[in-house]
Amino acid sequence: MTERIAALRGWFEGAEGPVFKELAVDPEGRVTGEAKGPSCGETGEYGPDCLILPGDVNAHSHPEQSVYAELVDPSWDLATWCRHTIYRHSVEMTPELVYLGCCRAFGRMLLAGVTAVAVSFYCHNRRGNDLDREVIRAARATGIRLFFGRMHYDWVAQDAYPAKKASQESYFETPEAYERALEELIREVQDDPLVAVAPALHSFHANTLEGIVRGIRRGALLGLPVQFHLSEDRGDVDLCLRLYGRRPVEVLDDLVRRGEVPGLDHLLVSDGIWVEDSEKDRMAEHQLSLVANPRMNRRVGAGRTDLKGYLDRKIPLFLGTDGEASNDDLSVAHERRFAREAYPEVPAASLGRRAFPFPGTPVGLAEPGFGADFQVLRDGTVEDVYVAGRRVVHRGRLLSLDLRRDVEAPLRERTASWRN
């Protein structure tokens, strides 16, 4: 790992165009402001042919799904995609496969300028934290900043086809077992400033109402964001209407009004496609945040998120890529470009950068107190990348791993039978 820089000097992205300045970085890898004099350590310096931007935040990702990238047909809808990927192969996921898949995903993110990622991980496979630890190991091996949502999955569809049911059974954990594993993992990473573990929930179709209540409460108690898939497809709406007599956001709103959860302002929900305007009003009232995954939603035919409706209500909006195997790539810059083209009714500035609440150190902006996470572009291409002031990509190459030798070769070997 490279030494942490004490300052970064060059032309930074500004509202009116590039601005020349030098930002100071403290020993913990946070921006302290513009440098007042010569730095006491190494300075990263770039000329006028480079542009320095904050590192992108991928606010919703399933990195282990990168193992399926060569197996998919881009024409598959969501149900077909699930049948031929996670419900066919996730029960076969070993620690090594999770590690290699995540190294592939995190490495490709860093090469695309993504410096922090929020992961939703539910592939526990009856192994406690064994597979979860491999995601964390991959983040450390590549150098990315990881917000790890240890996802609870406590619902098995009894009428599911055999492979789907077997997969769901492998993800399943009782609330008590889940909470023990979560607490264990939080303790294990508590001294790592680049890894945060938080409770996460899958969805209304993969969680009981008890599980949802406990997860929301746990996140509030810990003061951590809780990730949750919200109305990604019509099925969750139909399920909530059948079981609870209300639409998904109405169910969440009712939990607050009955005092079962203290609030929803720490929920980081993804997709939000099949959400009515009245539900958006309640989301704004309860201060939920939304992660949109527009390219993935288009590709699998899930639907189109009403970005303007959310932004009009001042609901904080982040961008994510979901999994690589259900998207074109893992670039948030490409996600942003697609959103600006696909949503001409939305002001481009609304799809820009915003602060992401990474525990202990916010990220996403080049401002004092934020993590010193930067991407340096030369002719529009990512040249160098810094995470917490340490360079992890140089001249378009990941510094910590040889991706072709250390990841791609063994991954192809381990999954060869999947392609036959």
Regions found by a protein language model. Name each.
Residues G55-A59, V117-V119, L146-R150, V197-L201, ...:
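Hydrophobic faces of well-ordered beta-strands that scaffold small-molecule active sites
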Residues R247-G263, T305-G380, Y386, R390-H394:
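His/Asp/Glu-enriched, well-ordered alpha-helical/loop segment
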Residues A220-P225, R257-R258, G263-D265, R282-V291, ...:
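Glycine-enriched alpha-helix->loop->beta-strand junction motifs that scaffold or abut catalytic
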Residues V67-V98, R127, W155-P175, R234-L264, ...:
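Active-site gating loops and adjacent loop-to-helix segments of metal-dependent hydrolytic enzymes
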Residues A69-R145, A177-D191, R412-N420:
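Alpha-helical scaffold segments that flank or form the walls of functional sites
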Residues D130-L267:
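Metal-coordinating catalytic core of metallo-dependent amide/deamination hydrolases
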Residues M1-K21, E28-R30, K36-P38, R353-N420:
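Active-site microenvironment of metallo-dependent hydrolases
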